[in-house]
From Swiss-Prot:
Phylogenetic classification of the source organism: Bacteria, Pseudomonadati, Pseudomonadota, Gammaproteobacteria, Lysobacterales
Family label: Belongs to the UPF0250 family.
SUPFAM superfamilies membership: YbeD/HP0495-like
Name this polypeptide is given: UPF0250 protein Smlt4048
Record Gene3D superfamilies: 3.30.70.260
């Protein structure tokens, strides 16, 4: 994740690369669907930085997606797009 600031009080700096994680049921194909969802929302996904991991019991999957955001609005749009998916239970 690339977040740059010469002053830590500034928060996120744009443009930049950011990482989101979303968790949901393992049998729903979220590892493929969520990156496509962000692309459809106009978010620039870094395809080679998409990863996922199943829970120890195999019931859930955590999908980690790196994306580029030009502005805070674009960053918020990416979060909202994932949160709005009916199968996503949590986002980080």
């Amino acid at each position: 994740m690339e977040i740059k600031s010469d002053n830590p009080d500034h928060g996120f700096q744009f443009p930049g690369q950011f990482e989101l994680s979303a968790m949901g049921p393992a049998n729903r194909g979220l590892e493929h669907e969520l990156p496509r969802l962000l692309l459809a929302a106009g978010i620039d996904v870094v395809n080679e930085r998409i990863s996922w991991k199943h829970s120890s019991n195999g019931k859930y999957v955590s999908v980690r997606i790196v994306f580029k955001a030009e502005s805070r609005e674009q960053y918020d749009l990416a979060h909202q797009a994932l949160r709005d998916h009916p199968e996503v239970k949590w986002t980080l």
